[in-house]
Amino acid sequence: MESQQLSQHSPISHGSACASVTSKEVHTNQDPLDVSASKTEECEKASTKANSQQTTTPASSAVPENPHHASPQTAQSHSPQNGPYPQQCMMTQNQANPSGWSFYGHPSMIPYTPYQMSPMYFPPGPQSQFPQYPSSVGTPLSTPSPESGNTFTDSSSADSDMTSTKKYVRPPPMLTSPNDFPNWVKTYIKFLQNSNLGGIIPTVNGKPVRQITDDELTFLYNTFQIFAPSQFLPTWVKDILSVDYTDIMKILSKSIEKMQSDTQEANDIVTLANLQYNGSTPADAFETKVTNIIDRLNNNGIHINNKVACQLIMRGLSGEYKFLRYTRHRHLNMTVAELFLDIHAIYEEQQGSRNSKPNYRRNPSDEKNDSRSYTNTTKPKVIARNPQKTNNSKSKTARAHNVSTSNNSPSTDNDSISKSTTEPIQLNNKHDLHLGQKLTESTVNHTNHSDDELPGHLLLDSGASRTLIRSAHHIHSASSNPDINVVDAQKRNIPINAIGDLQFHFQDNTKTSIKVLHTPNIAYDLLSLNELAAVDITACFTKNVLERSDGTVLAPIVKYGDFYWVSKKYLLPSNISVPTINNVHTSESTRKYPYPFIHRMLAHANAQTIRYSLKNNTITYFNESDVDWSSAIDYQCPDCLIGKSTKHRHIKGSRLKYQNSYEPFQYLHTDIFGPVHNLPKSAPSYFISFTDETTKFRWVYPLHDRREDSILDVFTTILAFIKNQFQASVLVIQMDRGSEYTNRTLHKFLEKNGITPCYTTTADSRAHGVAERLNRTLLDDCRTQLQCSGLPNHLWFSAIEFSTIVRNSLASPKSKKSARQHAGLAGLDISTLLPFGQPVIVNDHNPNSKIHPRGIPGYALHPSRNSYGYIIYLPSLKKTVDTTNYVILQGKESRLDQFNYDALTFDEDLNRLTASYHSFIASNEIQESNDLNIESDHDFQSDIELHPEQPRNVLSKAVSPTDSTPPSTHTEDSKRVSKTNIRAPREVDPNISESNILPSKKRSSTPQISNIESTGSGGMHKLNVPLLAPMSQSNTHESSHASKSKDFRHSDSYSENETNHTNVPISSTGGTNNKTVPQISDQETEKRIIHRSPSIDASPPENNSSHNIVPIKTPTTVSEQNTEESIIADLPLPDLPPESPTEFPDPFKELPPINSHQTNSSLGGIGDSNAYTTINSKKRSLEDNETEIKVSRDTWNTKNMRSLEPPRSKKRIHLIAAVKAVKSIKPIRTTLRYDEAITYNKDIKEKEKYIEAYHKEVNQLLKMNTWDTDKYYDRKEIDPKRVINSMFIFNKKRDGTHKARFVARGDIQHPDTYDTGMQSNTVHHYALMTSLSLALDNNYYITQLDISSAYLYADIKEELYIRPPPHLGMNDKLIRLKKSHYGLKQSGANWYETIKSYLIKQCGMEEVRGWSCVFKNSQVTICLFVDDMILFSKDLNANKKIITTLKKQYDTKIINLGESDNEIQYDILGLEIKYQRGKYMKLGMENSLTEKIPKLNVPLNPKGRKLSAPGQPGLYIDQDELEIDEDEYKEKVHEMQKLIGLASYVGYKFRFDLLYYINTLAQHILFPSRQVLDMTYELIQFMWDTRDKQLIWHKNKPTEPDNKLVAISDASYGNQPYYKSQIGNIFLLNGKVIGGKSTKASLTCTSTTEAEIHAVSEAIPLLNNLSHLVQELNKKPIIKGLLTDSRSTISIIKSTNEEKFRNRFFGTKAMRLRDEVSGNNLYVYYIETKKNIADVMTKPLPIKTFKLLTNKWIH
């Protein structure tokens, strides 16, 4: 194509003219300016080709052809642009000194302003061109530029006007970051070289080849400014330009120096990592090379220590030097100089005897590894193409998708980068097997794949989950299995033909089989390491063998290339052919339907639904196996994508993980909603919400505007609230970038308070999901509440407030707790809540006239935030009020009735829930509400901080009876009177709990009467009567007299005039009489009830005599009364407030019944129906109605409640839930092995202490003549049954000393080597506590001894052998034991018999019958626990005499003689005891818990609020199935073992108040759900908070003539499915708690009485045994007592009637109890439930009750 002449461009403002350019023609279909990424390589090739063909032409003869124009252009036309770069950035052909460069002609024309401030240069436009100069011969880079090969016609061409240059030059990229500057400089230098300016670039010495001209300096300056913006330059570059902004050359020089320095460091590191030395070069030269590299790196700031340097050097040693790896591998502190001394020694020895073998000892494994056999005679080249990491025990293997099937032969160009620490077997070609074997030995006669990298071998793959093979000749029991889907790493399907077994016959003559899949679509046969591990085979890449767990070598591993291989010669061939398998697969697959076809046929349902339907036969004709599911995973249906398109969902877990580390109320989310339009000015238009990240507790505040001051006021309020109420400080607040949050006022406020604002990205609402979702939820609730209630829209924020209160109290499905529970607050008291918009009548305390109505209709909105009242909207006044003076308007149609739920109303429900809050409050008539619970196991059971401490201002007002009143409550003769709404107390009415919210519409007024077997522990019938049983009309009059009889003590002292009652009309049970009942206050009621004693054997009311209530039988003699008072006098029972006896008025006996069905309300769902109901007595109007509160879930009518579900009883789990594939859990190991304590212990000081303990143990074993040192036995000569493995274990004792113990592996000891009938006994903890208690009461001295190496004093009868200690180095020898070595099954029993015999024969002691390891004589008592002895004696010399006798035979050490009269501290079997003789004894574990609990990795909260109780009542353990993987399950079970193990140890030692929680959680160790773990953490947190608590004993009164042994019993009745009752007992000796027990009942109890009988039956045997022990140790008379709060149990024990024993289990137990009580002089007495300290053993209690029952004996 001919050249075309282009016109000059229009001049620029400086009047420069455009120079004419020349070039060879450019192909028309290629744009020379196109430098996009897709054409970069093509442009470079074209540039190189053009340069090679370039010739010089006259300036006037040729111009470059522009492919975008077909004809010559006018002067105004411009050259085309390419992407973001203007045309001047693309270097075109130019003259050496162009005439059009007058603007850049002289440096003086460059603006001299600071570069970083305002360069003010004139960037060249399309009219100006950059100069291009011939490249010089030298370049600053180590390698020439790929485009620097430009040549010129001759040297004289430089003098001509035109210069031969490149046709076009690609510009450098724009600099976008200071960190990218080093890489950008490289591209910029390349750009200069391609622009023929290579000569001006500084060389290695910092000087350019030639001087730069002014035009070149201008070009350099402008291009640098264009492509390197000042804001992206590094600091050091800006510093240079600040001095001289044109000094670009200095920047280039500095950059080249940095690149050279970095290159040198990289080269040194690579050289050091790839050191190779075999003695071929002098050792001096090798040492000099290595030390120079290390010194150079250290000087450059890269520190190489001796350990790393030695490892790198030893890794490169080969030949005769290779053994240095093994001889010095244990020397941890070896230096480089020491290593080179060994290298020099070997090198000199080689030089001295070059042709002889070296005389130093070589490692046998080295000789084996160095022997090679090559099939060719040429010298092989060892190539390690895949570098292995140092000290990596598991070598890298390849995945199937990484293996290429082409060009698999090793390349000679690959560099040897590094080798593993133990050099693996490497093959250099297919014939080099490296094991001395021929090729024919490792190949298989069957089909081989000739293109394999290593034929006849299987590739070991650690990433493959299945084994795959291409040949069918090794597949056994093959069958088609189309359901298996196999994908590679790119998620591509691998078709599977068949599945079968792959059988190995290893070199130890064992056969092993694994599953294998057949497919021809893989490059190599893959052997999965995971499937090998499943059959107990592991790959050891340090030895390069396959081995079993016991160390048996099965086959060698070959390393070839990058991968590891195993020979196929170990595979057993089969008779199956490839066509057989392929035909089977083909015949199966031909009948399959493609999944897209089925998907379309079944209405585009998803694959999971279709597959599940086919599996369950909901679709017939074809089965699941008839569908080809291979494409179901990746199949994307275009129609589904269009038709089912949805918005992007919120990303789960998108919040940053560090937020989880914040404590409660430290990280808040906030957002503002609004505005809401068309509202009155008084109504808020916005609200601002806050959510705590940890607890998810929410706050909302109304706003009228979004001004800075308004937002600041809210922030000030909530920060102060959190600080004062929760003692927390807010650290971070996350919010969006709205102006209300980004203003300067709020920013300064947050900065002043030390709060970090965390802003989300603009317009990214998903990043603010917590606050956004809360606003959406609250608005949904708001719309629903307004729609349901029909209230006006301006009350919208009240609906938001109501929703917030409720939402904070609802449990989250994820955390299983509510926000209030997370925040440590009590649950929401539903009795204080009304439906939103409930019609009420509000009392007008200030009417306009005395004759005006006092009631104003209103609608309840939400509980008040600032008082105990309610926020109520008054439409007539158009305002809201905060008041407690309201009553629910019944029978009034509300908005709820518009839905016509079969005309259902909720009046009775509201009465029952809010009976005590419906009333008007008259002036000065406010009374405190105190719920009572008399003679019940259920004291305060539901009072879980639900009641505030302040009194409630509540009274009731009369309303008209509703249509829902049961007709059975009226007869034709009855009068139309109003009824009193008596609210059922929370403590006894389970139907007010979460398990039953709403009652049945139909009610029955007939009381339910049951037999005595189903009564509560207080002896009351299950009539659920508050105080007394209901009486028939016939004996009503007689009951009046009974109320004034001896049923109530001191009845005459309390007159009716002192009560100030308000008479309330009530209806009798029969509905025929209406009587007036004086209204009684709560305190007065309690005073009257407390002394009332109903009869234990009382029959049902219809069979009663005239006196309906009969007191319990009292002692008939003064001595028995004294015994009862004596037993109870010294017990640490809680102090109750003094109460005055009270007489009940006659009409009060006719209160209607309250039907109570007790539910479980404990940690694990344990409940207790052993409770009386109580009455909340309030002042009421004379016109109040009486409404029976009786709820039965069985009578729920679903037709009457279409929109509300019936209440469901929540299931509680008290059984261990099934977990799939659960294997046995190994016990937790608390000791260290030899390698952990010594070999690899990095703590030098601790290691030295363990070494010292090791030698001490060995010396002690030799001293004690533990084994026969005269003869060592060969292992092969001894029966394996009699050989016991041995090991060293190390641990750190409580006193800080380090201990080593050489033990035998008794856990694998054969049963024939010991007598299974022998037992190892230790002192029972009850015996120790009894001895300590008697020691305190009798001023005994307590001496603590320790016998060193106790077991070694006992001889062994059996013939047993063990392995010698490792330091002897006799691995193949055995030694015969002579002593009872530690760890043997019989050692404990042998020692017990030895020390028992010595104490009896030599010390004159005798063992207490029934109490092993408790010895006594006339002066001394000894408690023996293995090698620990505790001596008790009134005379210290008696203890010293025993010590002297013991030292004659045993190495006895006195730990504490106990001779001081001041306080003495002991550490006895883990108990930290403080004992001052004759005064007190304190038992605790503060120091031990302070040390151990932090090591449990429990998230303790030392700075937060301390827990006041170990658990919360009302929490239930969910029964949902636990689905977690095996590793996580084992990890959590091990964690539970540690936590519950420590808690059990502490609980059974002295913290008996924790036993219930420990026992409940111990039942769930194998069910470690999140909820169980949280409860366990809470228990450990409570132990941490109360670690300083102690069991306090005080000396008994010296005047007491008898020892008093008492058992206090209690039980909680488990009346739910999957649940049993809980029983508990506490034992006291002379008023001191010595033991406790809490456990699940072994038998299913059908009533509370049975549970109580079970508890008593468990206590009596231990009580009798303790009685015998006390009598043996102290000769005083003993009084035995048993206390229970179940009157029915006492009645059964004392009664002679046997007719009511209906089942054989508890009937037998009851009869046995009668015999034991009568035959053992056991006193059984009743104790009030409020004083029953055993209550803590059977149920979780509220904080107040828990403290009341425990603060007397543990504090």
From Swiss-Prot:
SUPFAM superfamilies: DNA/RNA polymerases (SSF56672), Ribonuclease H-like (SSF53098). Residues 1338-1476 form the Reverse transcriptase Ty1/copia-type domain. Initially, virus-like particles (VLPs) are composed of the structural unprocessed proteins Gag and Gag-Pol, and also contain the host initiator methionine tRNA (tRNA(i)-Met) which serves as a primer for minus-strand DNA synthesis, and a dimer of genomic Ty RNA. Processing of the polyproteins occurs within the particle and proceeds by an ordered pathway, called maturation. First, the protease (PR) is released by autocatalytic cleavage of the Gag-Pol polyprotein yielding capsid protein p45 and a Pol-p154 precursor protein. Its main location: cytoplasm. The modification Phosphoserine is found at residue 416. Retrotransposons are mobile genetic entities that are able to replicate via an RNA intermediate and a reverse transcription step. In contrast to retroviruses, retrotransposons are non-infectious, lack an envelope and remain intracellular. Ty1 retrotransposons belong to the copia elements (pseudoviridae). The C-terminal RNA-binding region of CA is sufficient for all its nucleocapsid-like chaperone activities. This is Transposon Ty1-PR1 Gag-Pol polyprotein. It comes from Saccharomyces cerevisiae (strain ATCC 204508 / S288c). The gene is TY1B-PR1.
